[in-house]
Amino acid sequence: MIPVAEFKQFTEQQPAFKVLKPWWDVLAEYLTVAMLMIGVFGCTLQVTQDKIICLPNHELQENLSEAPCQQLLPRGIPEQIGALQEVKGLKNNLDLQQYSFINQLCYETALHWYAKYFPYLVVIHTLIFMVCTSFWFKFPGTSSKIEHFISILGKCFDSPWTTRALSEVSGENQKGPAATERAAATIVAMAGTGPGKAGEGEKEKVLAEPEKVVTEPPVVTLLDKKEGEQAKALFEKVKKFRMHVEEGDILYTMYIRQTVLKVCKFLAILVYNLVYVEKISFLVACRVETSEVTGYASFCCNHTKAHLFSKLAFCYISFVCIYGLTCIYTLYWLFHRPLKEYSFRSVREETGMGDIPDVKNDFAFMLHLIDQYDSLYSKRFAVFLSEVSESRLKQLNLNHEWTPEKLRQKLQRNAAGRLELALCMLPGLPDTVFELSEVESLRLEAICDITFPPGLSQLVHLQELSLLHSPARLPFSLQVFLRDHLKVMRVKCEELREVPLWVFGLRGLEELHLEGLFPQELARAATLESLRELKQLKVLSLRSNAGKVPASVTDVAGHLQRLSLHNDGARLVALNSLKKLAALRELELVACGLERIPHAVFSLGALQELDLKDNHLRSIEEILSFQHCRKLVTLRLWHNQIAYVPEHVRKLRSLEQLYLSYNKLETLPSQLGLCSGLRLLDVSHNGLHSLPPEVGLLQNLQHLALSYNALEALPEELFFCRKLRTLLLGDNQLSQLSPHVGALRALSRLELKGNRLEALPEELGNCGGLKKAGLLVEDTLYQGLPAEVRDKMEEE
């Protein structure tokens, strides 16, 4: 006997593969099992029983025919037969060994090959059919994709997020009490599929209290943190799998090839079986030259299994015909429909997730096969193709991670004294942010695709909003809220055209800070959105690569008080529009590639502060024109290449702060002492070798920075500046400090590190405001002071 279990390995497949088997593949699988049983049964009979039985033919005939053998077939019994007729048999004088020899010889020579090998052919053909059907499940290039797809499909089908997403959409689409009840029933039914008895108990509880389900959010739709992370990982797997599978169509072509091969195999089997099935006969005439051994050369043989084999052959042909029809239908299905494209149109309409994309190639083909099994699989799988669904999940995970208590721990006071919440590099904006009604400043950095929800209106104290590389969409209903509450707006992006348009409609805005580049072809024009709606704007800061001052700046000329232009080294050419800013008090032109002080600045009669940091200024002869800016009190010319200060600096009598650090100055003009209103003078990081004695005329001077120069001595007149509080002399070449330093009674900070001092004058003890913390000097020099001086400085 041939055990059928030996053939089990040919049909064994993972149970999960059944989702990729349409009805015709399932039918074909059962047909192959039936055909295999026919073949195995025939082989068993062939092996275990006699194949053929032969008897010698006593009639001597030169040409052997089947006529004598046909006489042995059953015929009608004669009507009249003698009552006492003696039956005599023929003696053949053959022993058992001779009969066996003749049987085997006639089986090999006289019996047709089809009758001999029919059961073996059935088994071989059936095994080939089985291999063709399951080849794409075994071939490495296709099996890996199939296994990966089925693994992801099962996780998507069982994921709690799928249930939640579909139930939420169902709840949004349905209206009215009846619809609410149906949505609740759907949620309960979905929850009932979960593992364990807890789900059944919850289902019974909800069914028992239908009103409670309608009024309260069902617990079964909530995800814990672990389930949320699993769903998030599943979204990433689906994305990567889609990118990988949509690149080719190996699954589609492999399925077509194996189907075409099965059709060709079916036609070949059908043709030769119909031709040779009649060769299976009950009687077979056999002529072999064995007269010298047995005494006979002609035999009549009986093929013992011919009758059964003929019936099995017709049965097998019937099964093959049905199998072939399924293969032909499969080919029709493959070529009649666009299986390399799959549309989720019906799913989009049913679920309301309009962003579910259509797929192609192998991904589409597998989804078509899934629909033949159960279309619910593709519907639930589509949830993980939707970006809307993914954003909802991210939002849910964010809300789990960023609780209100955790957010309150991040609250800090910013430089403006506002209570600020800063969030950086998050996948989204947590809804819990809007539960912190005490927030006054919201800073969002590197957060992609922000859409402010209606909960933003709960931040009733919000005054400042910063969007740093965080593109944001604002519903129209919230624009009124921000227009009434927001005072400061900061936006930083790659290009200025990415600045949201709703920013320019915030009428209550007082400060607007924009940072981003103009496209290379638009940098010279420097076109910015109109600022006419910003009626309250007082401060405008723009960091870009503009070739000129944007024309829209003049829209706020009547009330703009501070303008800051940071050009990152790009040359700012056209500055004439600055003349229209009559109310401007502070102007910053930083890194604008300026080589001269712009003449347009001298027309700003209300100007109080001017900052020209990090430009290419070499000469400041135009400084005389600042006498027209009668309110100018602060002038910052630091980080330039200025080699000298002109003598007519004396005209700036109202100047209170002058910054000339990080230049190339070697001397200062004596006329600088005529700037009697000067309170702060910073000439650090230059090449000064000496100070003019006229510096002692600066009686209002409180801060003097001379660090990082080449000073060898200080004029005695310097110590006439009795109001001096800060004196920075670090990193010079001073060899001694005058005892007159004791006259600076208001001095509270003195820096002497990096000089050639050998000792400190004990008159430092007369500087009542100078403490140890304010004296920056080497420890050895400090220890050289008298003990009473040190004790006085260390007193709190």
From Swiss-Prot:
**Catalysed reactions, as listed in the record:** chloride(in) = chloride(out); iodide(out) = iodide(in); taurine(out) = taurine(in); 2',3'-cGAMP(out) = 2',3'-cGAMP(in)
Question: Keyword Hydrolase: yes or no?
Answer: no
Q: Where are the transmembrane segments?
A: 23-43, 117-137, 266-286, 314-334
Does Transmembrane helix count among this protein's keywords?
Answer: yes
List cellular component terms (GO): cytoplasm; endoplasmic reticulum membrane; lysosomal membrane; monoatomic ion channel complex; plasma membrane
This protein's UniProt keywords: Cell membrane, Disulfide bond, Endoplasmic reticulum, Glycoprotein, Ion channel, Ion transport, Leucine-rich repeat, Lysosome, Membrane, Repeat, Transmembrane, Transmembrane helix, Transport
Record localization? Cell membrane; Endoplasmic reticulum membrane; Lysosome membrane
Q: How does it sit in the membrane?
A: Multi-pass membrane protein
Could you name the domain of life of the organism this protein comes from? Answer: Eukaryota
| Residue ranges, Extracellular side | 44-116, 287-313
For this chain, the annotated S-S bridges are C54-C301
| Main subcellular location | membrane
UniProt GO BP: aspartate transmembrane transport; cell volume homeostasis; cellular response to osmotic stress; cyclic-GMP-AMP transmembrane import across plasma membrane; intracellular signal transduction; monoatomic anion transmembrane transport
Q: Which SMART domains match?
A: LRR_TYP (SM00369)
> Where on this protein are sugars attached?
N63, N302
Q: What does this protein do?
A: Non-essential component of the volume-regulated anion channel (VRAC, also named VSOAC channel), an anion channel required to maintain a constant cell volume in response to extracellular or intracellular osmotic changes. The VRAC channel conducts iodide better than chloride and can also conduct organic osmolytes like taurine. Mediates efflux of amino acids, such as aspartate, in response to osmotic stress. The VRAC channel also mediates transport of immunoreactive cyclic dinucleotide GMP-AMP (2'-3'-cGAMP), an immune messenger produced in response to DNA virus in the cytosol.
Domain note for this entry? The volume-regulated anion channel (VRAC) channel forms a trimer of dimers, with symmetry mismatch between the pore-forming domain and the cytosolic LRR repeats, a topology similar to gap junction proteins.
Q: Which family does it belong to?
A: Belongs to the LRRC8 family.
Protein name as it appears in the record: Volume-regulated anion channel subunit LRRC8E
